[in-house]
From Swiss-Prot:
It is an enzyme of class 2 (transferase). HAMAP family: TsaD (MF_01445). Its EC number is 2.3.1.234. The keyword Transferase applies. Its cofactor is Fe(2+). This is tRNA N6-adenosine threonylcarbamoyltransferase. Belongs to the KAE1 / TsaD family. It comes from Rhodospirillum rubrum (strain ATCC 11170 / ATH 1.1.1 / DSM 467 / LMG 4362 / NCIMB 8255 / S1). CDD domains: ASKHA_NBD_TsaD_bac.
């Protein structure tokens, strides 16, 4: 198989339908996005305040073919010019995952190309290998709407979980607080915008598990504290100032929690792998500027290098799926047509279940 490997990636795990073509850089470090096409379903789900799985699956089915055609066209390629087809195989909303996997399998069969099922979480985890060309191992905080984990990423398909949320993910807490305050969907960007105008010291909110041993996280109690704070305010609609101060106080609490857990994880990671390795932040929550600033300081104090994907690649996208396809294709790791989509697919299948983590999606 000739270099460079050009891989078509398809992402349909939640509320973005996307296709992209990626190839490795000429020097073998990092990669290049040849083309990408993405359709967000935000407006379709906004009236419901969150993602409706049936609507998401139908939208993926309606649009995935045209996005694949667009991505290939922008790359100047046909399906016969690519070296493999990769698709998110899980975890995610199973209806959408099925759409992407079946589309990728059909293209692979027609073109006679390998099919690669990608763990959506590994897509986030390896994005910085495409954008920054960093080497293994590195410490990863993966924080999104459905997942919040600290992992030692040691290779393709090799990650050791150091900590995880025992209840809500950080992004889920952002979404629920936004809904509580009437800020709409998606909640993360709305809370961040409101927080810029607010006073993070006005409301004293808890920092769950702060200074406790281990690297596990918790956000359910913080979310509840915001609701209780709202209930103590004078009756009637919240003022813009109240909303801004609540958002700023909540965001500061999340930043403190993530920073504290990352400090603990950095100590564990550095003891195993040596100092000076990267601290990587990925997932939708990594787009939050306040959280990036807090974690940049953690990296500095721990003698680590802070690395995060470009903002456009923090949220779900197909380029990260195609890139994992490149990484796996290099190693000869391809899948058969018998692969079954997985609603759950942990990055570290050997990690014990966190105490109280009954609702954790990964």
């Amino acid at each position: 198989m000739s270099m460079p490997f050009r891989v078509l990636g398809i992402e349909t795990s939640c509320d973005e339908t996307a296709a992209a073509v990626v190839e490795p850089a000429a020097d073998g470090r990092g990669g290049r996005i040849m083309a990408e096409a993405l359709l967000s379903q935000v407006e379709e789900h906004r009236p419901y305040g969150g993602v409706v799985p049936e609507i998401a699956a139908r939208s993926h089915l309606d649009h995935v073919d045209s996005l694949v055609i667009r991505a290939l066209g922008e790359a100047g390629l046909t399906v016969h010019d690519i070296d493999a087809v990769a698709a998110t195989g899980g975890p995610g909303l199973i209806g959408g995952v099925i759409v992407g996997v079946m589309t990728a399998k059909a293209i692979a069969q027609v073109a006679g190309k390998p099919f690669i099922a990608v763990n959506h979480l590994e897509g986030h985890a390896l994005t910085v290998r495409m954008t920054a060309g960093i080497d293994f191992p590195y410490l990863l905080l993966l924080a999104s709407g459905g997942h919040c984990q600290l992992l030692a990423v040691e290779g393709v398909g090799r990650a050791k979980r150091l900590g995880t949320t025992i209840d809500d993910a950080a992004g889920e807490a952002f979404d629920k607080v936004a809904k509580m305050l009437g800020l709409g969907y998606p909640g993360g960007p709305a809370v961040e915008r409101a927080a810029r105008r607010g006073d993070p010291r006005r409301f004293r909110l808890p920092r769950p598990l702060l200074d406790r041993p281990g690297c596990d996280l918790s956000f359910s109690g913080l979310k509840t504290a915001v609701r209780q704070t709202v209930e103590k305010l004078p009756p009637g609609p919240l003022s813009e100032g109240d909303i801004a101060d609540l958002c700023a106080s909540f965001q500061a609490a999340v930043a403190d929690c993530l920073a504290d857990r990352c400090r603990v994880a950095a100590g564990i990671f550095s003891a195993r792998h040596g100092r000076g390795r990267p601290l990587v932040v990925a997932g939708g929550v990594a787009a939050n500027a306040s959280l990036r600033a807090a974690l940049t300081e953690v990296a500095r104090q721990a003698d680590m290098t802070f690395v995060a994907p470009p903002l456009a690649l923090c949220t779900d996208n197909a380029a990260m799926i195609a890139w994992v396809g490149v990484e796996r294709l290099r190693l000869g790791l391809v899948d058969t047509m018998d692969f079954k989509p997985r609603p759950r697919w942990p990055l570290d299948p050997d990690a014990p279940k966190a105490a109280g983590a009954g609702g954790v999606k990964a």
